[in-house]
Amino acid sequence: MSKPFVPTPNISRPATPSSLDYGKDEASSTLLRDMGERGDRERKDREERDKKEAMPSGQDQVLPILSYCAASIMMTVVNKYVVSGANFTMTFLLLAIQSSVCVLAVTTVKKLGFISFRDFDKNDAKAWWPISTLLVAVIYTGSKALQFLSIPVYTIFKNLTIILIAYGEVFMFNGAVSGLTLCSFALMVGSSIIAAWSDITSVWNKEPELDPITGLEITVGPVSTIGGLNAGYIWMALNCFVSAAYVLFMRKRIKVTGFKDWDSMYYNNLLSIPILVVFSLVIEDWGSESLALNFPASNRVLLLSAMAFSGAAAVFISYSTAWCVRITGSTTYSMVGALNKLPVAASGILFFGDPANFGNISAIAVGGVAGVVYAVAKTNQAKVEKARQARAAGGRP
């Protein structure tokens, strides 16, 4: 008779508390090791981020600042050279060439992978069309003003646009104008009066020219004067108002479209081309005689090259501006922009023989001080606004 089945007893040692603790210790050490590695990675990422966000040294800031200043001077000088021809009247054609070159340049740079912006979209174009039209008016009136005014006077009067923009922001965006800002505005107006004083007094003190036969006053004057005053001041006033409208309405439209800097530049130039071409064909004289006067054979190649170069320079200005803001910060950039008006104004004296008299020099100096005071005022205002927002959010200023 067979024996009943009896399971073989387990003669192995049961798990001891020490072996269980060993497994727990191994899991804990793995967890701690993972946490340590993750902490090391986070610390390295934080160090790299802090390194990127740290303000570059003064030596690192020199190149972007010089690039921004050089781009501003170069653009002003080239435009002044192009429009200063004795018989140049085809401003719309000039602007069309500049815009075409600019679009070609940014498209090429985009394909090379250096920048990125939106592809063309009909809805975006429809929304941005009024802004491009305003830009055409800004550039055209600015070119006409630069045609009749010296670079120092043009640069100084351009400051008046800041006043119009500031008060436009008060009405459209609930902005505010501080006392220091008002001081800068007073200096801007004063510098403009100093710059234009010689022309103003010449109009007041000018004796009427009489016809030797009839003895009557001769009222026919050169095309460059309106009411005896340099026509450039009329164009400059129009430019200031249109420039302020362009900046204010573009700010509102950017909120709708969500455009970035390169998007704005691309659409501005692309949409302005058909407007400029139509105005050039309708208004400007395309006859052979007019073309010969506007583009004389003696410097035709140089003139056309300067037009194309100025279009490409617009891309350089946009890049150098973004580079300067990124490296130096908005405060330093605003100060550089204020002080940069001095070499831009001085370029007219150096390259175009504008008189270096007491009126011009003092106007440039007062305008430079006005720009610095305005930059300081805007910086202080930004700090106050940031502190106010921090208090509203419940944080510490």
From Swiss-Prot:
Keywords, sorted A to Z: Cytoplasmic vesicle, Endoplasmic reticulum, Glycoprotein, Golgi apparatus, Membrane, Sugar transport, Transmembrane, Transmembrane helix, Transport
GO molecular function: antiporter activity; GDP-mannose transmembrane transporter activity
Topology in membrane: Multi-pass membrane protein
Record: glycosylation sites: N87
Positions in the Cytoplasmic compartment: 1-61, 109-124, 169-174, 250-272, 322-332, 377-397
Amino acid composition bias (Polar residues), ranges on this chain: 9-19
Keyword Transport attributed: yes
Region of interest (Disordered), ranges: 1-57
Transmembrane segments: 62-82, 88-108, 125-142, 146-168, 175-197, 229-249, 273-293, 301-321, 333-353, 356-376
GO cellular component, one term: endoplasmic reticulum membrane
Subcellular location: Golgi apparatus membrane; Cytoplasmic vesicle membrane; Endoplasmic reticulum membrane
Lumenal topology ranges: 83-87, 143-145, 198-228, 294-300, 354-355
A GO biological-process term: GDP-mannose transmembrane transport
Sequence ranges of Basic and acidic residues compositional bias: 34-54
Function: Involved in the import of GDP-mannose from the cytoplasm into the Golgi lumen. Involved in capsule synthesis.
Quaternary structure and partners: Homooligomer.
Family per similarity comment: Belongs to the TPT transporter family. SLC35D subfamily.
Full protein name: GDP-mannose transporter 1
Organism: Cryptococcus neoformans var. neoformans serotype D (strain JEC21 / ATCC MYA-565)
Gene symbol of the encoding locus: GMT1
